[in-house]
Amino acid sequence: MAFHNRRWNFTFSCCVVVLLLPLVAARPQQPSAATRVHEEYSTFRVENTEWTFNHLAVDHRNGNVYLGAVNRIYKLSPGLDIQVSHQTGPDEDNRNCYPPRIVQPCSEPLTLTNNVNKMLLMDYRENRLLACGSLYQGICKLLRLDDLFKLGEPFHKKEHYLSGVNESGSVFGVIVSYGDASPDKLFVATAVDGRPEYFPTISSRKLTRNSEEDGMFAYVFHDEFVASMIKIPSDTFTVVPDFDIYYVYGFSSGNFVYFLTLQPEMGGGPTTGSSSAGREQVYTSKLVRLCKDDTAFNSYVEVPLGCVKGGVEYRLLQAAYLSKAGTILARSLGIGPDDDILYAVFSKGQKRRPKESSQESALCVFTLKEINERIKDRLQSCYKGEGTLDLAWLKVKDISCSSALLTIDDNFCGLDMNAPLGVSEMVRGIPLFSESKDKMTSVIAYVYKNHSLAFVGTRGGRLKKIRVDGPTYGALQYETIQVVDNGPILRDMAFSSDQHFLYVMSESQLTRVPVEACEQYSSCNECLGSGDPHCGWCVLHSMCTRKEKCERSSEPRRFASNIKQCVRLSVHPNNISVSQYSVMLVLEAHNVPELSAGVNCTFEDLAEMDGLVEGNRITCSSPAEKEVPRIIVDQGDHQIVQLYLKSKETGLAFANTSFVFYNCSVHKSCLSCVGSPYQCHWCKYRHTCTHDPSSCSFQEGRVKQPEECPQLLPADRILVPVNVVKPITLRAKNLPQPQSGQRGYECVLTIQGVEQRVPALRFNSSSVQCQNTSYMYDGMEMSSLPVDLTVIWNGDFSIDNPAQNKVHLYKCDARRESCGLCLKADPLFGCVWCKGENRCSLKQHCSYPQSMWLEHNGINSKCTHPRITKITPLRGPREGGTLVTIRGENLGLEFSEIKDHVKVADVECTPVPEGYIPAEQIVCEMGKAERSQFAGNVQVCVGECRPEFMAKSSKYYYFVIPQLLSLKPSRGPISGGTIVNITGGNLDAGSNVSIMFKDQKCTYQRRGGQWITCRSHASMQGYGNVSVSVYVDKAHIHKDLKFEYVEDPTITKLEPEWSIFSGNTPLTVSGTNLDIIHTPLIRAKYKNLETINICQVLSPTTMQCMAPELPYSISKHKDVPERPDEFGFILDNVQSVLALNNTNFVYYPNPVFEPLSVSGVQELKPGSPIILKGRNFLPPTPGGNGKLNYTVLIGDKPCALTVSDTQLLCESPNLTGRHKVLARVGGIEFSPGVVHITSDSPLSSTAVISIAGAGGLLIFFIVIVLIAYKRKSRESDLTLKRLQMQMDNLESRVALECKEAFAELQTDIHELTSDLDGAGIPFLDYRTYTMRVLFPGIEEHPVLRDLEVPGYRQEQVEKGLKLFGQLINNKVFLLSFIRTLESQRGFSMRDRGNVASLIMTVLQSKLEYATDVLKHLLSDLIDKNLESKNHPKLLLRRTESVAEKMLTNWFTFLLYKFLKECAGEPLFSLFCAIKQQMEKGPIDSITGEARYSLSEDKLIRQQIDYKTLVVNCMHPDNEKSPEVQVKVLNCDTVSQVKEKILDAIYKNVPYSHRPKASDMDLEWRQGRVVRVILQDEDVTTKIEADWKRLNMLSHYQVTDNAVVALVPKQVTAYNSVNNSTVSRTSASKYENMIKYTGSPDSLRSRTPMITPDLESGVKVWHLVKNHEHGDQKEGDRGSKMVSEIYLTRLLATKGTLQKFVDDLFETIFSTAHRGSALPLAIKYMFDFLDEQADKHNIHDPHVRHTWKSNCLPLRFWVNVIKNPQFVFDIHKSSITDACLSVVAQTFMDSCSTSEHRLGKDSPSNKLLYAKDIPSYKSWVERYYSDISKMPAISDQDMNAYLAEQSRMHMNEFNTMSSLSEIYSYIGKYTEEIVSALEQDDGARKQRLAYKLEQVVAFMSLES
């Protein structure tokens, strides 16, 4: 082929490249095929986005292409290279200027107007092109075809103005020839755009030979009565104001000219009158016919066209094309092959929506013959006087037909009577093909080898190729290709002159597409099965092509054109074993041409050999031994290899078949061996599988059939109770008898991963028994455990178990804590409820007589004492219908037992069989309650209502009345998808809720007590209001709520239409109705990945969006722009904007920055500009105005920028020193390095010289002195040298330390963020969390336990406490009680905190009341604070009152959800980051000091050499699981290593659920035998002087990649601690002591370990000897270094952790973060403080700020930050604690309003964050200001929220125990409290003192 030598520069459509990739890969030996398709696709794109393409014409004589566009006409070569272009616009114009301004001046304002090309016609006779535009009322140019030279442009007469309409697709012209003698005529039809008086809608014009002649475009005939034109009467516009006729296609055939139109219907249907009344206009498609010779247009006839497929009407014409029928289609239609047929594309229905939402369309075919017959029939009936003229738009009123005696033949051209005429009955086309996803928009067709082929363009830019064989055979869509990037494809399509190519056009590109792409099919079946009539199979070249392109295709069987002619190949034998070599194979080939040139046989890439051809048989041999494929166990037992026949003539494979190599020895069981499809035999006694029967004799037990295999037979469930000795007998067949030297049978049971082997006995060939043994499994979580059972013999020969029999081990008492659950167990288990022991056990294990048993079907089979544990819901409507779920114990075993025995609040509740779980759960449906019923408990009787069979709930079920208040938003799009929030009361009652918008459901989503949300559906009723009602079970709640469906939002414009790959550039979006969408999103889809970004609505017509990023890894991008596959918006459910068709959105490559310099540091003088180099800084947008919004920060100061494509010039701000440079653009942030700005020397040259001179003199003087000194003393000289060396040494180490610190800072940040992967966050449950905050350090607090009172006093005490509880719930009493306690001297700070916490535990279930009391107490506190003339800022600073601790507790209760959903994550990340960063360096296990620290006190100030090791640790729970790699340091103590290993293995396990390091020993495993236990102290521990150093890994010389294991602690004295040292018992005692103090610090942070051992006086150390022991000898000073130098490490650590600290602060100090709204409690309390400040006339913002800071950040957050163990299940070490304290201090400083003056003497932790605190302060101020701007929370909303919180945590604490604890204070201060109550008026009225005395009496009464 000659193609691949040329170079082509065409831009190809992407889809073709994709299409071809598999092809190129599959057949590399034929590059030309791919190249050819590549070069056949060529594309011409718009030069300017405004100059969109309109029309297309191809010169069929030479193939040149003419393209009409906005403002341009182009002449292109057949390959779409541009040859000439002719400019047609833009020009000054106004559409209202008639006649246009080029004829006479116009008073309208003129603007530069584009010229749309509306018509492009080839006038072959005169070799010219007619190009009509939209400028100047639609004048036309005549251009010479060769060079587009303008031959003429008539514009001065009114017939020169075709129409002012500026749509390109509503005008059509047909040039008609009348033989050589007469000139041609032009029939032109156009839409008139509401100006019927100026423009005829259809007319015939003269085409003069001379293009400049006066008569050009004159009407063919014109006098005062008649003209060759038709105008639309103005009356028509009074009926349908926007009436117009749109012309879609036109052609001439025979004696007639035809036009296809789309026009509004005039009928008296619903559309009569103004279409603006909201009704949609109905359209109809019609064909118009005129005689060619008719000058008066009497022959005008109109016929409606349409198409019906599958009951769906398609009536809106989109495109049409006239073609010949072709033999096959003609035969099917009953016409001649050369008859004309008309293809037409219609879309569904008759309503033309602005952006037609329906994508459904159909391709239909009409025969012209039938249309003409139908017109002839109508003409005949009309001239008989039947019916009316039926042309409503032209005649407006009905006119009857007049009769006349005429013969009407096929060519009748009408008279001036009965004309023009309309046919009322629609001509139905034959539907060929329909499409519902991608609307068809254009069609063209031709006949190839008798086949009719239609090519259809679609809205999505695709081309469908359809073979049309007619109604009997149907239509086959055989290929679809993506031709243009952005659809739709326009109506004009054209074939090249040789019909090998098709020109397809969208508004922005014209593409040449080959009509066939046969090369894409790589096999004969694919090629001939494709349905493309162009394609056939060229056999020996093994390619799909047209016949004329296949060499010697006329010879027999060399070219296949039918799928039956494809080559078929078979081989015998078609499989062999891998151990057989060079076997002769016979291949039989069918449909092959003669193969005289010879063939080769090829086994893929294994082997190739000559084949011997005899007729159609070919003989080959199989591969030799070294070429046979190796088959390994993983691949199965065989490998399929393709066997190819290669022609020696072409060198190509032309036929292939599958050949199998199999390997029997892969099979390890008899059944799989003999069940293999290959010849495999099983050797029973050798337990092997072979293909060779001779290698396994009959004596060796050869097996061929599955029935003969040794195997276990299916058994019923094998049940074995645990710990019961029992044999297991199994049925089998063909069990082999072990031969001499072979071992006997065993059963292998794998229980929880552990293998248990049991000897077994073979009774005979059909039975085997596992001997008496008992079995056991761990845990009580499973009541039964299926266990795999394998029977083996001779050690490892397993017997097949095809039924996969399992042994079921079971425990009666597991998961059967109640009688009901016990009796529910499988009867075969034999479990009984042992009443005496109150447990479920086997009969034989119950030590009581049988009368004390309950068993399933025994005499006693009914459980007593049913119990109800839970009821949901607890509230419902009176109307009933609520499904109440009752959970409990012993709730019957049969449904019949409880069927009629359930009452809820005294209302019958009918149990539902489906919801019944025996013994555990009843679901019943509530009946209707009376008005008088309000609440009651739930009562269930089992069988009979005797006390022992009856259960009553402790909780009540309440009847409530749900109510509706309002809904928001009250309107949404007609397409639905709006999230509607309905507010009201009691909306969480009942079990089922549904929301109706009139007759339509609104999909329920969530609900709470006062709200329900649902998602609206698309409206069925159209626009307007619908009433909203809610059903809660059977209650129908109705209020006059309305939801309005309004028109869907539309998107009209995007600016700009580009972004960069990383997105996040601002876009302005214009459209309509945008404000009805609450959360609009913008989306992009690329390569099946989707990204979204947010939008903000600014007004109903505009919104601002951030561009989504291109969803594709940036690294895969070359530097080329990309277009997303889809780009659009998610606006609720509005489908029309999901993927915009009218946008050309482009993504340009991201800007790329280069580093500032190789070292990353650039030296600069002040004022010098900083130049950032790179590329893509200015996106190459079409208008060239693509600007990105860059920000460049030097340090934290922005700089002014000048941007070019490769440089950013930054005017550096007035700074000196080192500063990081940071560039931001879109979604990218990049730091090209650091600038170092050094200031110039301020000294003058004279000063410099004089200083230098003075310096010189000084040096001279020093030298003299030194010489003198040297002479004086040699000794001091030596000392000096020694000092000098030490100084050098010190200096180099300082430098090294600084350099290390810097390097660590740079690398650690990255490592840390990548290491902290999303481990689950171990949140504590609500109860544990609140207890840790309320009662810190107390593990088992009484409020968690039941009240402990001696039995004889219990009733008395409970009565007393209930009374006391009522008093606590009395506000007067409670306030008086608290005030009295606070006024007592003995009432300590600790007591205050305790009382506040106890009161809050009692009031947990009544938070509204608690809040009210708290507000009173706080108000008192503020009054007291201001009265005592304290500084108002001190308010709430310290916990000196009950109120302050109550406030902390209040926040503790109400911020749990916020912690869990929002703030917990960054807090946990910070904790993990600190822990991880600390552990990367050495930590002294005794002093708690660390190399990495935020706290100066906990910083190791020495240089410690250490190395990181990786140890491989066995999993303690499962040694078989893979080893875990753990990073440790060689200077870690053994305990530290154990902790690190536990952290790694139990990474996602909460701390309390892990094994403790102290319970485990660390074993170092060296090889299989040697195991050394490593310990902190043992006999090998080194003791120097009186210091003993703990053992580290380096002490044991543990190597990198050593294998270690954690094993439970050994009791033996194996390398145990020497007695003279700190013994293990004393250490563990010490650990226990710490455990109960509740302190978070680790054992190591305590100094006691350093105190010398009393007996031996030995002190223990690890890395540094404690500073207090200043016993280092003077000689050691040489190794010391200035300790302050190590403070740089604080900075390194701070830098590493900065991101985590920022994240935490940002979360806490933002009003809406991570999807969680601001907790109501914060807003409510801040508003309360503001009210109090207003009340006391405090207007100082600092005071208000301080109150808020003291109230929330200091009271709650600081506590949580310092003590993350209050929130998470974790362990906090002393070094972590020290770092968190620094963070907490920074947090406190950020909340303060006072300025901190810092100097070099300030503490390091203040200096560390000094630079960050100002920005944190601004966050805090913004946070407080945002909160104050938020709308106030009403008391009603707050109370609802508090009630909800109370309900959620109702039973967390034991109220009785709490009351008892509070009562202890009453006992202590009885007299004082009673007297305070007697003095208070309110208390006297309520006789509270008397009531308290009653309580005291009850509590002290000794009965």
UniProtKB/Swiss-Prot annotation:
It comes from Danio rerio. Residues 1268-1903 are cytoplasmic. Residues 27-515 form the Sema domain. Belongs to the plexin family. CDD domains: IPT_PCSR (cd00603), IPT_plexin_repeat1 (cd01180), IPT_plexin_repeat3 (cd01181), RasGAP_plexin_A (cd12790). Residues 517-567, 663-710, 811-864 form the PSI domain. GO terms for molecular function: semaphorin receptor activity. Gene3D superfamilies: GTPase Activation - p120gap, domain 1 (1.10.506.10), Immunoglobulins (2.60.40.10), Phosphatidylinositol 3-kinase Catalytic Subunit, Chain A, domain 1 (3.10.20.90), YVTN repeat-like/Quinoprotein amine dehydrogenase (2.130.10.10). This is Plexin-A4.
